[in-house]
């Protein structure tokens, strides 16, 4: 049955979401809405929102303009609420390091938004037989000014 096959897939397929941690989820400068938001309404959707006690929007922060948003899509909020997805807040530095590594190793310049997904990888453990699918969308060349302004030099560590 479809329900049975859906349960089989649910047991075998793990979903990980990377959200923009900015300077850290405790810094006050973050866009990690799943970690730091609360239930509210934004742009007609009831979802998690970065807001104060009165429901007023709190300005989020992320190095990525595309992730610098005070809400989260209802689908992602539901995946987190139902414990169907593991959500990690990826800070700016982690995203930049991951972007530089992908560029160095593969010659692919990821958009800053996708760099946050890449930034989760160092924290994760995989088995040799695991199949990992990670989407890299957008064009990193639009973010070159940001990458150059925050140049990561692996020799400084």
Where do the PLM segments sit?
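Short, small-residue-biased leader/transition segments that mark boundaries at the very start
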Residues: 2-9
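Catalytic phosphate/nucleotide-handling subdomain of diverse soluble enzymes
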Residues: 13-18, 26, 120-157
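Active-site/ligand-binding loops adjacent to catalytic centers
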Residues: 17-108, 149-157
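Short, electropositive, low-hydrophobicity segments enriched in small/polar residues
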Residues: 70, 111, 142-144
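A short, acidic, amphipathic alpha-helical segment used as a generic capping/interface helix at domain edges
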Residues: 92-97, 116-126
């Amino acid at each position: 049955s479809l329900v049975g096959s859906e349960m089989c897939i649910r047991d075998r397929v793990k979903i990980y979401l990377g959200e923009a941690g900015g300077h850290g989820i405790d810094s006050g400068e973050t866009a990690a809405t799943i970690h730091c938001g609360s239930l509210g309404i934004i742009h007609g959707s009831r979802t998690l929102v970065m807001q104060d006690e009165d429901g007023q929007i709190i300005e989020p922060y992320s190095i990525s303009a595309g992730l610098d948003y005070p809400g989260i899509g209802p689908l992602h909020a539901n995946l987190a609420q139902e414990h169907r997805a593991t959500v990690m807040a990826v800070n700016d530095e982690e995203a930049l390091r991951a972007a530089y590594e992908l560029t160095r190793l593969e010659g692919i310049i990821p958009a800053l938004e996708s760099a946050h997904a890449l930034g989760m990888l160092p924290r994760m453990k995989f088995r040799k037989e695991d199949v990992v699918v990670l989407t890299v969308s957008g064009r990193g060349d639009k973010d070159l000014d940001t990458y150059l302004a925050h140049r990561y030099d692996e020799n400084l560590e």
